[in-house]
């Protein structure tokens, strides 16, 4: 016996069976952001002087470059997950919903590539 009406079965309304994975990834990325954010704040205190030379030296350490890249990618993935939920819940017209989701993915991907490329470029010897 099903609790769904025949009309809802035909329309395909109901669970998409993907909510748990999305919910779980939001929690995992939030936990990773707490850890990476704590590392980033400690690193800012350790740097002390935010001059260009000090920042390049700090970022030239491979561990710092990897952790900062992880921080940027995790932050943007977490943001993408949250914005996806807002779009799915509050944008009604299907064309706007699909367009908004595609635009969100494009912007987040562009920001991630730009951020990681910038970190790698600076860590490989600065901008000179």
Residues covered by each model-derived region:
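Membrane-embedded alpha-helical bundles that constitute the cytochrome b-like, heme-associated redox core
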Residues: 1-128
């Amino acid at each position: 016996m099903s609790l769904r009406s025949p009309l809802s079965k035909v329309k395909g309304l109901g669970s998409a069976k993907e909510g748990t994975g999305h919910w779980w990834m939001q929690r995992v990325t939030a936990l990773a952001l707490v850890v990476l954010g704590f590392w980033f704040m400690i690193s800012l205190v350790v740097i002390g002087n935010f001059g260009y030379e000090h920042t390049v030296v700090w970022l030239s350490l491979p561990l710092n470059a990897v952790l900062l890249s992880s921080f940027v990618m995790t932050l943007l993935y977490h943001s993408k997950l949250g914005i996806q939920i807002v779009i799915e819940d509050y944008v009604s017209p299907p064309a706007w919903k699909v367009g908004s989701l595609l635009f969100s993915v494009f912007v987040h991907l562009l920001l991630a590539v730009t951020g990681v490329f910038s970190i790698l470029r600076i860590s490989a010897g600065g901008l000179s």
